Structure formats: C-alpha cells, structure tokens
Amino acid sequence: MASSTNSTVEPEDHAMADAPTNGVGHNHHPAGLREYREGVAPLSTDDIDAAMDEAESPSETVEALKLMRRRGMLPTGCCYDDRMKLHANADFGPTPHHPEDPRRIEEIMKMFKRAGLIFTGPDTELLDILKENPTKYMWRIPAREATKQEICTVHTPGHYDWVENLSHLSTRDLRALSMTLDQGRASLYVGGMSYEAALLSAGGCIETCKNVAAGNVKNAFAVIRPPGHHAEYDSAMGFCFFNNVPIGARVCQQEYPETCRKVFILDWDVHHGNGVQNMFYDDPNVLYTSLHVYANGEFYPGKPDNPMIPDGDLDKVGDGPGKGKNVNIAWPSQGMGDGEYLAAFQKIVMPIAKEFNPDLVIISAGFDAADGDELGGCFVTPPCYAHMTHMLMSLAGGKVAVCLEGGYNLQAISHSALAVARTLMGEPPPKMDMPPISKEAARVLARVQAAQAPYWECMRPGIIDIQRVGNDASRLHDVIRGYQRQVLSEKHGMFPLFIQREALFRSFENQVLITPDVQTKQKILFIIHDP
C-alpha cells in the first residue's frame, strides 16, 4: 500500500480493509479502519489560506503553490481516498458485483497512474518537479469527511441522521435494509461503512471545488464514490446518499461570496440528476444543465410519485427567479452518441453557459453514457468526453471541477475519465469529424431551444440554428418561414433581402422581406416580430 508520502493514495490489489486514511485528519474514526502515519501530505484549502496569511516562513508546499501562482501556471488537482471503497453491499446475494462497484474508482486511479498523470515518488520530489513544470503531474487534493453543517446546506438534518444511523446497524439489519431498498426508484444498497464513505465523497467534492474556486489549482478531478446526483434533500436514492456537487457548490458560494457567486453545473450522466435539479430549481445563481435519456419518463429515475415534483422532461425550466436556470436535454431513447452530444453542446449547452457567465463550472461526470456501458446503452467515446471538457474549460476562466457520478463498465469509465483528465491537464482533444445526428435528437434540441427561448437571448429564433439532418430533411422553422414568404409575396409583392454574410445567411434566410420601392421612398416602416 502506498504511504502518505505519495502524491496521492494509489489503489493496489489487496483487501479493502487495508485502505489508508490518506494522511488526512477526520472527524470520525470507525472501527476497522487502520491508522497510517502522516507524511508530507498536501494541504487543504483552509490550511493553504491560513499559511498564505502568515508572514512567518510558510511550508514548502505553500511556497511551491505561491511560486506557481506567480508564474501563472497551476497544476490540475486530483482528489482520491481509498476509504471510499469501503462502501459495499451488505446483501451478499448471488450476483457477484453490484453495478456501483468499489472497483470503479480504483480502476480510474490505476489508469491515471499507468498513463503517467500521477506522480508515485516522494512529495518532496514532486514539489521540485512542479516548480519547474506545474502541469506535468496532478496535484493531490486530500479528501476529508464533510461536516454535518456542510451537508445540511442542501439536506435536512433528518436525512443526515438517517445516513449516520447506518453505521450503528447490525449486519443482519443492513442486509435486510438493502434487500428492501435496492429495487424500484429507491435503488440503493447500504453497508456498515456507507456513512463514512459518503462523508468522504462529499468532503472530497467540497475540497476539490474549493481548491479550484480559490485558485490553488487550475482545475481538478474528484474520483469519488458513492455518487450523489440522485439524492434528494430529504432522502437517499439511486446509489446516492449525499448530493456531493450541490454541497460543494453551496460551500463555495458561502465561503467565496465575491468570487464564486454564479455556478454552472453540467451533468452528462446518462440518468437525470433529479436531486441536483430540485435543490436549485428556483435559484437564479445556479445554472443546471443535464443531458440524459428520458424516454418519456420510463428511464431511471423516471417520474416522481408526487406529480408536483418536476421530472427530467425538457419543459422543466425552473421556477420563480430560477426560470431558465434549469435546462434538460432529454433524449427520447438510448443509443445516443458523439454526434448528439456534440450538437447539444454546440447548440444549447455552450451558448446558454456563455450567456450565464459562471464563476465556477462543476461537471457531474457520470460515464454511463460511454460506449460499452450496458446500463446506459449509449455510445459516447473518450474523444467526445475530451471535446466536451475542452469546451467547458473556456468558461469561468478555466475553473472547472470534475466530480465523478455514475458509470459502471470498468473499462469504459477508466478510459473516459482518462480522456477528461488529459484534457484538464492541457492535452488537446483528439481530432474528430462531426458525426451525424439523428432526427429524433435534432427535434429534441429544437424543442429545448423553444423551451429556453423566453429566458436566453441565444436561444431565440435566428440566433441558433439546428443543423439539417440528412440531405432530404428541412427544419420546420424553414418550412414555416418559406410559406410566410410566399403569402407576403402574393399579397404585398414583398421579396427577401439578400444577406451577403455567409455566416448569417442560413439563419436569416427568408426572414428579412422588403417591398420593391424601399430604395425610392423617403419614409421606411420597419415591422419587427417573432416568426
């Protein structure tokens, strides 16, 4: 087992009972966790801020960060803790592995290590290396247990207490509870270490987001579990206990009110992040955009039992001051791939995000839409994940925190995560041709545009243009405008004004009509209206 002198705690092939504490102090010391000596561990954001404020000889770690800040070059952060693997199913049924498998995070870290993204030598050597080349390796961000106060920024105290109580149940009770919960919409298993792992997952997300928001790293990847985006404010569901990303967003907004006011959460997990949506549904300062399979509410998480609670359909745009801050790109079926996701980014995600102009971007990075994931049934490739990440890095001054959500094929999740991490570290995304987009997906994007048009200038007709699908397909917008042109021509002799700029011609074709005498009349009447 790698000791705390390594740049991050690295997974190796041995029993989960040997999971280290990662050299990080924590609030709760559950039985069965071994204590490891502390080495030269990286500092938390609170440690760094405190040391930065002290005039007397800050540590070598802080000096290295200050040097990298002055040079304008910061490393990419990586948060990981082996103890999160201790969350395991208490129901030892005939199925060998539950989809939300502890090996998910281990495989990602092994992939990072094999690819040379993680430094495996002493921290003292890493400091010297990063002083010379800050982007060569990922900077270790230690995970810690989230506090009850932090978790209750988005959850009820009653829900926190319910999760905490899991650590006091007997194995028999946990097994019975798992058998009851692991079905239907609840879809949750529990174990003796679920509470501790959930605290670390939430705390790891918080520290990742804070390090990015504070400028200690340029961006970061939190390799954490259990995931969070299905957890509601008062209940656990969908493999999720605490909703990590909203907790991280709220803590950053509270601790950095001047520099982290607006947060953009992009969720590319194949399942709708119902919990994230509901926590920010009326919040004007958090933009939540989700790309997910909806399938008329038949795909998980489906429709809530309470019809008053919004689901993942594309007409759910937010409420009150939060209208327009909830964007659901709800695919009609599985089978979506690179073409659909890149089109969604180019036509919907990025235009709205740029208009929102966030201070921090958090990616709820589920990789179950990846090619090879049996549960997701979609075909998004690692190069596509790299391109989507690269586009998001153009926002918020590059402050992007990637937090793991779902993804259940070990090979697909590790390769997809590697593509994202390499992009965060500055490697250009691989060249890709724009794949074709299905007619069904094009219709969804057009409907999303229409649903969001009242709230975003970039979504209004003429500003955004959904591409044609195939040589024999026409946009409904073009058909309607062509008919309007014919009527105006027959009744008033009007004809279209030629637009010379090629970039504008397609979007505004047949939209600017004039009468033949426009150049000879002294008075001109302009009529401007929606199509």
Give the role of each language-model region.
Residues 120-122, 164, 232, 299-301, ...:
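Intrinsically disordered, low-complexity regions enriched in proline, serine, glycine
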Residues 206, 210, 221-373, 377-382, ...:
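Conserved alpha-helical scaffold segments that buttress catalytic/binding sites
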Residues 511-516, 521:
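A structural signal for the main folded, soluble domain(s) of proteins
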